[in-house]
Protein backbone atom coordinates (compact mmCIF):
# COMPACT_ATOMS: atom_id res chain seq x y z
CA UNK A 1 0.00 0.00 0.00
CA UNK A 2 1.19 3.50 -0.77
CA UNK A 3 2.95 5.23 2.08
CA UNK A 4 2.79 8.99 2.67
CA UNK A 5 6.15 10.56 3.44
CA UNK A 6 8.48 9.73 6.28
CA UNK A 7 7.69 8.47 9.71
CA UNK A 8 7.02 11.88 11.24
CA UNK A 9 6.08 14.19 8.37
CA UNK A 10 3.58 16.75 9.67
CA UNK A 11 2.93 14.78 12.86
CA UNK A 12 4.21 14.78 16.44
CA UNK A 13 5.09 11.08 16.53
CA UNK A 14 6.97 8.54 14.43
CA UNK A 15 10.27 7.57 16.03
CA UNK A 16 9.00 4.13 16.94
CA UNK A 17 7.86 3.43 13.36
CA UNK A 18 9.97 2.19 10.46
CA UNK A 19 7.64 3.77 7.89
CA UNK A 20 4.94 6.39 7.67
CA UNK A 21 1.20 5.81 7.61
CA UNK A 22 -0.66 4.66 4.54
CA UNK A 23 -2.31 7.43 2.56
CA UNK A 24 -5.78 6.33 3.66
CA UNK A 25 -4.62 6.21 7.28
CA UNK A 26 -3.18 9.71 7.03
CA UNK A 27 -6.41 10.98 5.49
CA UNK A 28 -8.45 9.40 8.29
CA UNK A 29 -6.22 10.89 10.98
CA UNK A 30 -6.09 14.37 9.51
CA UNK A 31 -8.02 16.99 11.49
CA UNK A 32 -6.70 20.37 10.39
CA UNK A 33 -9.89 21.03 8.41
CA UNK A 34 -11.70 21.60 11.70
CA UNK A 35 -9.19 21.89 14.54
CA UNK A 36 -7.44 24.86 12.92
CA UNK A 37 -10.04 26.89 14.83
CA UNK A 38 -7.95 26.11 17.91
CA UNK A 39 -4.78 27.68 16.46
CA UNK A 40 -4.94 31.02 18.35
CA UNK A 41 -5.55 29.14 21.59
CA UNK A 42 -2.75 26.68 20.84
CA UNK A 43 -0.28 29.54 20.41
CA UNK A 44 -1.44 31.31 23.55
CA UNK A 45 -1.14 28.08 25.54
CA UNK A 46 2.28 27.40 24.03
CA UNK A 47 3.50 30.76 25.29
CA UNK A 48 2.23 29.92 28.77
CA UNK A 49 3.87 26.49 28.55
CA UNK A 50 7.17 28.08 27.51
CA UNK A 51 7.09 30.28 30.59
CA UNK A 52 6.47 27.24 32.79
CA UNK A 53 9.38 25.40 31.13
CA UNK A 54 11.58 28.42 31.83
CA UNK A 55 10.42 28.52 35.45
CA UNK A 56 11.33 24.82 35.78
CA UNK A 57 14.83 25.49 34.43
CA UNK A 58 14.20 23.67 31.17
CA UNK A 59 14.45 26.74 28.98
CA UNK A 60 17.13 29.42 29.18
CA UNK A 61 16.34 33.12 29.26
CA UNK A 62 17.58 33.53 25.71
CA UNK A 63 15.66 30.52 24.45
CA UNK A 64 12.49 31.76 26.16
CA UNK A 65 12.81 35.15 24.48
CA UNK A 66 13.44 33.52 21.13
CA UNK A 67 10.53 31.14 21.54
CA UNK A 68 8.05 33.83 22.64
CA UNK A 69 9.09 36.07 19.76
CA UNK A 70 8.67 33.17 17.35
CA UNK A 71 5.22 32.38 18.75
CA UNK A 72 4.18 36.03 18.46
CA UNK A 73 5.26 36.06 14.83
CA UNK A 74 3.45 32.80 14.21
CA UNK A 75 0.29 34.19 15.82
CA UNK A 76 0.39 37.20 13.52
CA UNK A 77 0.85 34.99 10.47
CA UNK A 78 -2.02 32.72 11.52
CA UNK A 79 -4.30 35.73 12.05
CA UNK A 80 -3.42 37.20 8.65
CA UNK A 81 -3.66 33.90 6.83
CA UNK A 82 0.01 33.95 5.88
CA UNK A 83 0.50 30.66 7.73
CA UNK A 84 -1.93 27.82 7.10
CA UNK A 85 -1.74 24.05 7.54
CA UNK A 86 0.19 22.11 4.95
CA UNK A 87 -1.26 19.05 3.29
CA UNK A 88 1.15 16.91 5.31
CA UNK A 89 0.14 18.39 8.69
CA UNK A 90 -1.84 15.90 10.73
CA UNK A 91 -3.42 18.38 13.12
CA UNK A 92 -3.23 21.93 14.41
CA UNK A 93 -0.54 21.01 16.94
CA UNK A 94 1.82 19.54 14.37
CA UNK A 95 1.23 22.41 11.97
CA UNK A 96 2.04 25.04 14.59
CA UNK A 97 5.15 23.21 15.79
CA UNK A 98 6.32 23.15 12.19
CA UNK A 99 5.61 26.86 11.92
CA UNK A 100 7.53 27.60 15.11
CA UNK A 101 10.54 25.55 14.04
CA UNK A 102 10.55 27.34 10.70
CA UNK A 103 10.87 30.61 12.61
CA UNK A 104 13.22 29.78 15.49
CA UNK A 105 14.94 26.57 14.41
CA UNK A 106 14.64 23.00 15.61
CA UNK A 107 17.01 23.47 18.57
CA UNK A 108 14.74 25.99 20.28
CA UNK A 109 11.41 25.09 18.69
CA UNK A 110 11.85 21.42 19.50
CA UNK A 111 12.07 22.15 23.23
CA UNK A 112 8.47 23.33 23.50
CA UNK A 113 7.01 19.84 23.41
CA UNK A 114 8.69 18.84 26.69
CA UNK A 115 6.21 18.04 29.45
CA UNK A 116 3.08 18.15 27.37
CA UNK A 117 1.06 15.76 25.24
CA UNK A 118 -1.53 16.37 22.60
CA UNK A 119 -3.90 14.80 25.12
CA UNK A 120 -3.65 17.52 27.77
CA UNK A 121 -3.03 20.13 25.11
CA UNK A 122 -6.21 19.59 23.11
CA UNK A 123 -8.33 19.14 26.22
CA UNK A 124 -7.17 22.56 27.37
CA UNK A 125 -7.56 24.28 24.02
CA UNK A 126 -11.07 22.87 23.56
CA UNK A 127 -12.10 24.32 26.92
CA UNK A 128 -10.57 27.69 26.04
CA UNK A 129 -12.34 27.83 22.69
CA UNK A 130 -15.65 26.74 24.17
CA UNK A 131 -15.56 29.23 27.02
CA UNK A 132 -15.21 32.00 24.44
CA UNK A 133 -17.78 30.41 22.14
CA UNK A 134 -20.54 30.20 24.72
CA UNK A 135 -20.02 33.86 25.60
CA UNK A 136 -20.59 34.79 21.98
CA UNK A 137 -23.73 32.68 21.97
CA UNK A 138 -24.88 34.24 25.23
CA UNK A 139 -24.55 37.71 23.70
CA UNK A 140 -26.81 36.63 20.84
CA UNK A 141 -29.34 35.11 23.22
CA UNK A 142 -29.48 38.37 25.16
CA UNK A 143 -30.17 40.23 21.92
CA UNK A 144 -33.26 38.04 21.51
CA UNK A 145 -34.26 38.72 25.12
CA UNK A 146 -33.86 42.44 24.48
CA UNK A 147 -36.12 42.19 21.43
CA UNK A 148 -38.78 40.41 23.49
CA UNK A 149 -38.48 43.02 26.24
CA UNK A 150 -38.84 45.89 23.77
CA UNK A 151 -41.96 44.35 22.24
CA UNK A 152 -43.44 43.68 25.68
CA UNK A 153 -42.77 47.26 26.75
CA UNK A 154 -44.35 48.56 23.54
CA UNK A 155 -47.59 46.62 24.18
CA UNK A 156 -48.25 46.92 27.93
CA UNK A 157 -52.05 46.69 27.67
CA UNK A 158 -52.56 44.44 24.63
CA UNK A 159 -54.55 41.30 25.37
CA UNK A 160 -54.53 37.96 23.62
CA UNK A 161 -55.98 34.49 24.00
CA UNK A 162 -53.82 32.39 26.27
CA UNK A 163 -53.78 28.78 25.18
CA UNK A 164 -53.09 25.31 26.49
CA UNK A 165 -53.08 22.36 24.08
CA UNK A 166 -53.29 25.14 21.44
CA UNK A 167 -56.91 25.58 22.54
CA UNK A 168 -58.45 28.72 24.02
CA UNK A 169 -57.73 28.80 27.75
CA UNK A 170 -57.69 32.20 29.48
CA UNK A 171 -57.05 35.76 28.35
CA UNK A 172 -53.56 37.10 29.09
CA UNK A 173 -51.51 40.16 28.31
CA UNK A 174 -49.35 39.94 25.20
CA UNK A 175 -46.43 41.29 27.25
CA UNK A 176 -46.91 38.43 29.72
CA UNK A 177 -46.70 35.92 26.90
CA UNK A 178 -43.62 37.51 25.33
CA UNK A 179 -41.81 37.54 28.67
CA UNK A 180 -42.66 33.85 29.04
CA UNK A 181 -40.24 33.30 26.15
CA UNK A 182 -37.59 35.53 27.72
CA UNK A 183 -37.41 33.59 30.98
CA UNK A 184 -36.21 30.24 29.55
CA UNK A 185 -33.59 32.08 27.50
CA UNK A 186 -32.33 33.75 30.66
CA UNK A 187 -32.17 30.33 32.31
CA UNK A 188 -30.11 29.16 29.35
CA UNK A 189 -27.68 31.99 30.10
CA UNK A 190 -27.53 30.81 33.71
CA UNK A 191 -26.73 27.31 32.45
CA UNK A 192 -23.91 28.67 30.32
CA UNK A 193 -22.51 30.54 33.31
CA UNK A 194 -22.76 27.41 35.41
CA UNK A 195 -21.07 25.37 32.69
CA UNK A 196 -18.26 27.91 32.59
CA UNK A 197 -17.44 27.25 36.25
CA UNK A 198 -16.73 23.59 35.49
CA UNK A 199 -14.99 24.33 32.20
CA UNK A 200 -12.61 26.74 33.96
CA UNK A 201 -10.30 23.90 35.04
CA UNK A 202 -7.06 23.47 33.10
CA UNK A 203 -5.85 20.00 32.02
CA UNK A 204 -2.45 21.44 31.05
CA UNK A 205 0.36 19.63 32.85
CA UNK A 206 -1.46 16.29 32.86
CA UNK A 207 0.65 14.94 30.00
CA UNK A 208 -0.72 11.93 28.19
CA UNK A 209 -2.49 10.75 31.35
CA UNK A 210 -0.06 10.34 34.28
CA UNK A 211 1.16 13.90 34.82
CA UNK A 212 4.66 15.29 34.39
CA UNK A 213 8.01 14.41 35.99
CA UNK A 214 9.69 17.63 34.85
CA UNK A 215 8.79 19.84 37.79
CA UNK A 216 6.25 21.88 35.86
CA UNK A 217 3.62 24.03 37.60
CA UNK A 218 0.08 23.28 36.34
CA UNK A 219 -1.42 25.96 38.60
CA UNK A 220 0.82 28.62 37.06
CA UNK A 221 -0.19 27.75 33.52
CA UNK A 222 -3.85 27.57 34.58
CA UNK A 223 -3.65 31.11 35.95
CA UNK A 224 -1.81 32.31 32.85
CA UNK A 225 -4.64 31.00 30.67
CA UNK A 226 -7.42 32.49 32.84
CA UNK A 227 -8.56 29.20 34.31
CA UNK A 228 -9.73 29.06 37.91
CA UNK A 229 -7.64 26.01 38.79
CA UNK A 230 -5.57 23.13 37.48
CA UNK A 231 -7.18 19.71 37.19
CA UNK A 232 -7.15 17.54 40.30
CA UNK A 233 -6.69 14.24 38.43
CA UNK A 234 -4.55 13.94 35.32
CA UNK A 235 -6.32 10.83 34.00
CA UNK A 236 -9.70 12.52 34.25
CA UNK A 237 -8.33 15.77 32.85
CA UNK A 238 -7.13 14.25 29.58
CA UNK A 239 -10.09 11.96 28.96
CA UNK A 240 -13.13 13.85 30.26
CA UNK A 241 -15.45 15.44 27.74
CA UNK A 242 -18.45 15.96 29.97
CA UNK A 243 -17.77 19.67 29.68
CA UNK A 244 -18.33 19.40 25.92
CA UNK A 245 -21.50 17.37 26.38
CA UNK A 246 -22.78 19.85 28.95
CA UNK A 247 -22.17 22.73 26.57
CA UNK A 248 -23.78 20.80 23.72
CA UNK A 249 -26.87 20.27 25.87
CA UNK A 250 -27.21 23.94 26.76
CA UNK A 251 -26.70 24.93 23.13
CA UNK A 252 -29.37 22.44 22.08
CA UNK A 253 -31.67 23.72 24.81
CA UNK A 254 -31.26 27.26 23.50
CA UNK A 255 -32.21 26.03 20.04
CA UNK A 256 -35.25 24.23 21.45
CA UNK A 257 -36.38 27.35 23.33
CA UNK A 258 -35.97 29.41 20.16
CA UNK A 259 -37.81 26.76 18.17
CA UNK A 260 -40.85 26.91 20.46
CA UNK A 261 -41.02 30.66 19.96
CA UNK A 262 -40.49 30.27 16.23
CA UNK A 263 -43.36 27.80 16.02
CA UNK A 264 -45.69 30.37 17.56
CA UNK A 265 -44.56 33.04 15.11
CA UNK A 266 -45.35 30.67 12.25
CA UNK A 267 -48.83 30.02 13.63
CA UNK A 268 -49.49 33.66 14.53
CA UNK A 269 -48.59 34.82 11.01
CA UNK A 270 -51.17 32.59 9.29
CA UNK A 271 -54.36 34.27 8.01
CA UNK A 272 -56.36 32.03 10.32
CA UNK A 273 -54.69 33.55 13.39
CA UNK A 274 -53.68 36.93 12.01
CA UNK A 275 -51.83 37.98 15.16
CA UNK A 276 -48.68 39.29 13.45
CA UNK A 277 -47.24 40.50 10.18
CA UNK A 278 -43.63 39.66 9.45
CA UNK A 279 -41.27 42.38 8.28
CA UNK A 280 -40.16 42.02 4.67
CA UNK A 281 -36.52 41.95 5.77
CA UNK A 282 -37.13 38.75 7.72
CA UNK A 283 -39.34 36.90 5.23
CA UNK A 284 -38.96 35.26 1.84
CA UNK A 285 -41.23 34.73 -1.14
CA UNK A 286 -42.18 31.88 -3.40
CA UNK A 287 -40.72 31.06 -6.79
CA UNK A 288 -44.19 30.37 -8.17
CA UNK A 289 -46.82 31.89 -5.84
CA UNK A 290 -46.57 35.70 -5.91
CA UNK A 291 -48.69 36.24 -2.81
CA UNK A 292 -46.52 34.22 -0.45
CA UNK A 293 -44.64 35.73 2.49
CA UNK A 294 -42.91 32.84 4.15
CA UNK A 295 -41.65 32.68 7.76
CA UNK A 296 -38.30 31.18 6.77
CA UNK A 297 -36.41 32.47 9.81
CA UNK A 298 -38.80 30.60 12.07
CA UNK A 299 -38.76 27.49 9.93
CA UNK A 300 -34.97 27.43 9.79
CA UNK A 301 -34.97 27.83 13.55
CA UNK A 302 -37.02 24.67 13.90
CA UNK A 303 -34.69 22.87 11.51
CA UNK A 304 -31.55 23.97 13.28
CA UNK A 305 -32.98 22.90 16.62
CA UNK A 306 -33.10 19.36 15.26
CA UNK A 307 -29.53 19.72 14.05
CA UNK A 308 -28.28 20.80 17.48
CA UNK A 309 -30.15 17.98 19.19
CA UNK A 310 -28.39 15.64 16.75
CA UNK A 311 -25.03 17.16 17.63
CA UNK A 312 -25.69 16.48 21.31
CA UNK A 313 -26.83 12.90 20.85
CA UNK A 314 -23.97 12.16 18.47
CA UNK A 315 -21.42 13.43 20.97
CA UNK A 316 -22.95 11.40 23.79
CA UNK A 317 -22.88 8.29 21.61
CA UNK A 318 -19.18 8.90 20.95
CA UNK A 319 -18.43 9.18 24.66
CA UNK A 320 -20.55 6.33 26.01
CA UNK A 321 -18.14 3.39 25.83
CA UNK A 322 -14.62 4.80 26.11
CA UNK A 323 -12.32 3.34 28.76
CA UNK A 324 -9.92 5.66 30.57
CA UNK A 325 -7.92 7.53 29.56
CA UNK A 326 -7.66 9.23 26.15
CA UNK A 327 -8.92 7.44 23.03
CA UNK A 328 -8.75 8.57 19.42
CA UNK A 329 -12.56 8.52 19.33
CA UNK A 330 -12.24 11.95 20.90
CA UNK A 331 -11.15 13.38 17.58
CA UNK A 332 -14.92 13.33 16.96
CA UNK A 333 -15.73 15.52 19.97
CA UNK A 334 -15.11 18.95 18.49
CA UNK A 335 -17.02 19.13 15.22
CA UNK A 336 -20.49 18.70 16.78
CA UNK A 337 -19.82 21.40 19.35
CA UNK A 338 -18.11 23.72 16.87
CA UNK A 339 -21.15 23.32 14.63
CA UNK A 340 -23.65 24.01 17.42
CA UNK A 341 -21.90 27.26 18.29
CA UNK A 342 -21.63 28.25 14.62
CA UNK A 343 -25.29 27.55 13.92
CA UNK A 344 -26.45 29.62 16.88
CA UNK A 345 -24.14 32.47 15.92
CA UNK A 346 -25.80 32.39 12.50
CA UNK A 347 -29.34 32.04 13.83
CA UNK A 348 -29.53 34.36 16.81
CA UNK A 349 -29.15 37.69 14.95
CA UNK A 350 -31.92 36.63 12.57
CA UNK A 351 -34.26 35.64 15.40
CA UNK A 352 -33.58 38.90 17.23
CA UNK A 353 -34.29 40.83 14.03
CA UNK A 354 -37.48 38.87 13.39
CA UNK A 355 -38.88 39.35 16.89
CA UNK A 356 -37.92 43.00 17.08
CA UNK A 357 -39.75 43.85 13.85
CA UNK A 358 -42.99 41.89 14.33
CA UNK A 359 -46.12 43.97 13.82
CA UNK A 360 -48.77 42.81 16.29
CA UNK A 361 -52.42 43.13 15.32
CA UNK A 362 -53.70 43.89 18.80
CA UNK A 363 -57.31 44.45 17.70
CA UNK A 364 -57.44 40.96 16.23
CA UNK A 365 -55.91 39.46 19.36
CA UNK A 366 -58.34 41.36 21.60
CA UNK A 367 -61.25 40.18 19.47
CA UNK A 368 -60.23 36.56 19.95
CA UNK A 369 -59.31 36.87 23.64
CA UNK A 370 -62.80 35.90 24.94
CA UNK A 371 -63.49 33.39 22.16
CA UNK A 372 -63.76 29.78 23.18
CA UNK A 373 -65.29 30.66 26.55
CA UNK A 374 -61.98 31.75 28.04
CA UNK A 375 -63.79 33.43 30.96
CA UNK A 376 -65.23 30.16 32.28
CA UNK A 377 -62.53 29.86 34.94
CA UNK A 378 -63.43 33.36 36.13
CA UNK A 379 -67.00 32.21 36.76
CA UNK A 380 -65.76 29.23 38.76
CA UNK A 381 -63.38 31.34 40.84
CA UNK A 382 -66.06 33.99 41.40
CA UNK A 383 -68.29 31.25 42.85
CA UNK A 384 -65.42 30.11 45.09
CA UNK A 385 -65.09 33.65 46.43
CA UNK A 386 -68.83 33.47 47.14
CA UNK A 387 -68.24 30.40 49.30
CA UNK A 388 -69.11 27.66 46.81
CA UNK A 389 -66.81 24.58 46.89
CA UNK A 390 -64.60 24.52 43.82
CA UNK A 391 -65.91 21.13 42.71
CA UNK A 392 -69.43 22.55 42.55
CA UNK A 393 -68.20 25.81 41.05
CA UNK A 394 -66.33 23.94 38.31
CA UNK A 395 -69.48 22.00 37.40
CA UNK A 396 -71.56 25.18 37.34
CA UNK A 397 -69.07 27.02 35.13
CA UNK A 398 -69.04 24.06 32.76
CA UNK A 399 -72.83 24.14 32.63
CA UNK A 400 -72.64 27.84 31.73
CA UNK A 401 -70.36 26.98 28.82
CA UNK A 402 -72.75 24.27 27.70
CA UNK A 403 -75.70 26.66 27.79
CA UNK A 404 -73.86 29.40 25.90
CA UNK A 405 -72.58 26.92 23.35
CA UNK A 406 -76.11 25.63 22.76
CA UNK A 407 -77.30 29.16 22.02
CA UNK A 408 -74.22 30.07 19.99
CA UNK A 409 -73.36 33.04 22.21
CA UNK A 410 -70.62 34.07 24.60
CA UNK A 411 -70.85 33.64 28.36
CA UNK A 412 -71.64 37.31 28.83
CA UNK A 413 -74.77 36.90 26.68
CA UNK A 414 -76.44 34.48 29.09
CA UNK A 415 -79.40 36.03 30.86
CA UNK A 416 -79.70 36.45 34.61
CA UNK A 417 -82.40 33.81 34.54
CA UNK A 418 -80.16 31.35 32.73
CA UNK A 419 -77.38 31.89 35.25
CA UNK A 420 -79.76 31.41 38.18
CA UNK A 421 -81.21 28.27 36.63
CA UNK A 422 -77.73 26.75 36.45
CA UNK A 423 -76.91 27.61 40.08
CA UNK A 424 -78.71 30.00 42.44
CA UNK A 425 -75.34 31.33 43.56
CA UNK A 426 -74.85 32.81 40.08
CA UNK A 427 -76.40 36.19 40.82
CA UNK A 428 -76.20 39.15 38.42
CA UNK A 429 -73.00 40.21 40.16
CA UNK A 430 -71.20 37.43 38.29
CA UNK A 431 -71.10 39.79 35.31
CA UNK A 432 -68.34 41.69 37.11
CA UNK A 433 -65.88 39.01 35.97
CA UNK A 434 -67.26 38.48 32.48
CA UNK A 435 -64.89 40.95 30.82
CA UNK A 436 -61.43 40.29 29.49
CA UNK A 437 -60.03 43.31 31.31
CA UNK A 438 -61.56 42.22 34.61
CA UNK A 439 -60.26 38.69 34.19
CA UNK A 440 -56.73 39.89 33.51
CA UNK A 441 -56.74 42.41 36.36
CA UNK A 442 -57.86 39.73 38.81
CA UNK A 443 -54.80 37.55 38.10
CA UNK A 444 -52.66 39.63 40.43
CA UNK A 445 -50.67 36.99 42.28
CA UNK A 446 -46.91 37.00 41.74
CA UNK A 447 -46.13 35.88 38.21
CA UNK A 448 -49.69 36.47 37.04
CA UNK A 449 -50.99 38.30 34.00
CA UNK A 450 -52.33 41.40 35.78
CA UNK A 451 -50.74 44.56 34.43
CA UNK A 452 -48.99 45.43 37.68
CA UNK A 453 -47.44 41.97 37.89
CA UNK A 454 -46.34 41.98 34.27
CA UNK A 455 -44.67 45.36 34.82
CA UNK A 456 -42.74 43.76 37.69
CA UNK A 457 -41.73 40.86 35.46
CA UNK A 458 -40.57 43.27 32.77
CA UNK A 459 -38.31 45.07 35.24
CA UNK A 460 -36.94 41.77 36.54
CA UNK A 461 -36.13 40.48 33.06
CA UNK A 462 -34.40 43.73 32.17
CA UNK A 463 -32.28 43.57 35.32
CA UNK A 464 -31.38 39.91 34.74
CA UNK A 465 -30.36 40.63 31.14
CA UNK A 466 -28.19 43.53 32.26
CA UNK A 467 -26.47 41.34 34.84
CA UNK A 468 -25.86 38.65 32.24
CA UNK A 469 -24.28 41.23 29.92
CA UNK A 470 -21.77 42.00 32.65
CA UNK A 471 -20.70 38.33 32.70
CA UNK A 472 -20.10 38.34 28.96
CA UNK A 473 -17.95 41.43 29.19
UniProtKB/Swiss-Prot annotation:
One of its GO terms (cellular component) is cytosol. One of its GO terms (biological process) is L-arginine biosynthetic process. It comes from Nocardia farcinica (strain IFM 10152). Belongs to the lyase 1 family. Argininosuccinate lyase subfamily. One of its GO terms (molecular function) is argininosuccinate lyase activity. It comes from the Bacteria. Its EC number is 4.3.2.1. Its main location: cytoplasm. This is Argininosuccinate lyase. Keywords: Amino-acid biosynthesis, Arginine biosynthesis, Cytoplasm, Lyase. Pathway: Amino-acid biosynthesis; L-arginine biosynthesis; L-arginine from L-ornithine and carbamoyl phosphate: step 3/3. The keyword Metal-binding does not apply. It is found in: Cytoplasm. The gene is argH. It catalyses: 2-(N(omega)-L-arginino)succinate = fumarate + L-arginine. The keyword Metal-binding does not apply. It is an enzyme of class 4 (lyase).
Amino acid sequence: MTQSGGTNTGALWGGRFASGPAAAMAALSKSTHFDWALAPYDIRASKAHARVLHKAGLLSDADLDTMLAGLDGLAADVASGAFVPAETDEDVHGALERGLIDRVGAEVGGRLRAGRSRNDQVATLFRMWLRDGVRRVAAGVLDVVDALVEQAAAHPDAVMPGKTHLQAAQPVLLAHHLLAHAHPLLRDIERLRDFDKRAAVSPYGSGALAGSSLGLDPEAIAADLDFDAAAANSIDATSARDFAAEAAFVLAMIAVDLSRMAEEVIIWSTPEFGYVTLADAWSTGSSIMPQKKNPDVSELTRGKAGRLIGNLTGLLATLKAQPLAYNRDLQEDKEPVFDSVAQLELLLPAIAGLVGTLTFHTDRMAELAPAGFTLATDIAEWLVREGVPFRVAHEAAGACVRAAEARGVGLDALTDEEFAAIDPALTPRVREVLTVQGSIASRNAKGGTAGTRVAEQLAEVRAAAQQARAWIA
